[in-house]
Amino acid sequence: RLPGGRDAMKAYQKQRAIAQCSRAKLNIVWGILRENRKERIIIFTADNDTAYRMGELLCMPVLTHKTKAAERKDFLDRFRSGEYPVLLTSKVLNEGVDVPEASIGIVVSGSGSTREHVQRLGRILRAKDGKQALLYELVSDGTSEMRVSDRRRQHRAYEQRRLQFYRQGYIKDGQENN
């Protein structure tokens, strides 16, 4: 143990919490929600604290591993029916849950895991006739989130999609990394 180590860790955790749920991110989320009122949206966070904080600020239902099975089923049923157009979650929807009704995902914060990110992308890409899906990833400028996001986007799932968009004319020369 180093002197000041505990203080350094607390400072790092505080910086990370601020980056994960900043006022700027909340404003962007709110803007996306306002512009997409008819869509079903899943908002992903890195941890329960961030999910609960956002849920309280935005008055939205939150699903975490602490949510009891019956309540989780109720939330998902209400989401599928459209009664709840938005769900906030930390990691509980990363794997094994089909929600083809979701057409937009917003990653407010996440881990450095490419697998987690691809799983989250998979939540909104589930097949449904005529469906188009969008995934927004919000990163705080000047933080480690930028580096982690850049690294994740090198995954072959993104490369294949970029190539498809390029061939269809959605991406022009010089825009491949945007």
Model-derived regions, located:
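Alpha-helix C-terminal capping segments
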Residues: 29-37, 52-59, 158
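Conserved segment of the helicase C-terminal RecA-like domain
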Residues: 123-154
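Long, largely alpha-helical accessory region at the distal end of helicase-like NTP-driven motors
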Residues: 164-178
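Interdomain linker/hinge connecting the two RecA-like lobes of the SF2 helicase core
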Residues: 1-40, 45-46
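A short beta-strand element within the Helicase C-terminal
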Residues: 88, 94-111, 116-117, 132-138
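Helical mechanochemical/support elements of P-loop NTPase systems and associated helical scaffolds
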Residues: 25, 50, 71, 113-117, ...
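Conserved nucleotide-binding/hydrolysis micro-motifs of P-loop NTPases
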Residues: 49, 68, 93-94, 110-114, ...
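Conserved helicase ATPase core of P-loop NTP-dependent helicases/translocases
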Residues: 40-45, 49-97, 116
